[in-house]
Structure formats: structure tokens, C-alpha cells
Amino acid sequence: MGKVMLEVNNLKTKYVTRFHEDVYAVDGVSLKIEEGKSLGVAGESGCGKSTLALSLMGYYFAPLHYISGDIIVDGRKISGMKPDDVRKNILGNEIAYIPQAAMNALNPTQKIIRFVEDVIHAHDPKMPKKDIYDLAKERFQILGLPAEVLQKHAVELSGGMKQRTVIAISTILSPKVLIADEPSSALDVTSQKMVIKMMRDLMEKDLSNP
């Protein structure tokens, strides 16, 4: 058995609202994922796949609430942590998330390099802009994106380029665990295959260069 990178034990989360009955969105989920391995979660629309993805990051905001269970990333328990602590210490470098409809996750009025700076500065506020640019340039090129993309706005990019840009930003700190919520759902079949292959190649590169 290889090193366990993500372990979840009897995780329970639920949606709590004033006007509706509480709903357990994740009810007793347990799983283990070893280093270098992947796990797919399948189910019909509305069954809770996206909620599970959000829950696994240990990052909760109303109406979604953590109830009980353990989430352990590379031996570090993150369940029950305060949202600010998760954002500063966990998201990005320990565990990263590529959202569903990722193409809509980019503010159209902001340059791409600013998104990269925000992610990195959350963990290393003193990193010089030149170092951030060099790191971003290398990561973007791995995903087939020219360095010029960093100076563009989201509205200037095609759908496929936006998707790859979100992947590049999400993985800029080489996270130990990557959670992808249907990252290729808005793309055509050819682009879907390309994005999935790039994600796999990216994670394999990070594993070989820890």
C-alpha cells in the first residue's frame, strides 16, 4: 500500500436554512486515496457530487455546514478548521479545487496574472512579482498556454484557454491533492480529452518533482 494522501472517515455535512428542513448532503462518506492515484465519483445530477467536492476541502460557508468526521490530507487533519485557516494554510498548496463551470470562475475585469498573485500571496505574501511571473509562465506553458495569456483578461480567452487557465492557477503551488468537479463539462469531446490528459501530465510532473 502506498502513502495515503487523502483520507476521509465518516464525513457528514448538511445544508441548514431557515425556511427548509435540514438536508444531509454528505452522510457518512469514507475513502482513501494513495499518492499518484485518482478516484472518480459518479452519480446523477443533484446527488451531491459537487457538495462532496467542496466538503473534502474542509472549506465551509453557510448554508453548508460541517457536522462530523475526519478529513486528513497527507497526515494533517483539516476537518473542523476555521475557514480563514483553511484558506491560508491548506487551499492551494495542500489541496486544490477546480470548480464546475470553471470558465465562469474568472473575473472578466482582472488580468490573469492577478489571480495567480492572489493564490500565491495567500501563502507567501513576500514572494516578488518577478518570481511569481516566472513560476506562472512555466506552469502555463506546461498546459500549452503562452506567457502572453498572463497579461490578458478572461474575456479575451477562448473557452478552452479559460479552462486551462483555471487549471494552471489552481495548481500553481503544486498541491498534494487535486479535486476537480467536472472540469471539462463545458468543452467539446476533443477538448475534454486534451484537458484531462494535461491534468494527468501536470500531476505526474509534480509527483516527480516534489
What are the roles of these predicted feature ranges?
Residues 178-181:
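Catalytic Walker B motif of ABC-type/P-loop ATPase nucleotide-binding domains
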Residues 78-96, 122:
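ABC ATPase NBD coupling module
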Residues 130-148, 200:
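Conserved ABC ATPase "signature" region
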Residues 2-5, 14-28, 59-65, 82-86, ...:
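A short, flexible loop at the N-terminus of ABC-type nucleotide-binding domains that lies
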Residues 66-77:
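Conserved ABC transporter NBD signature motif
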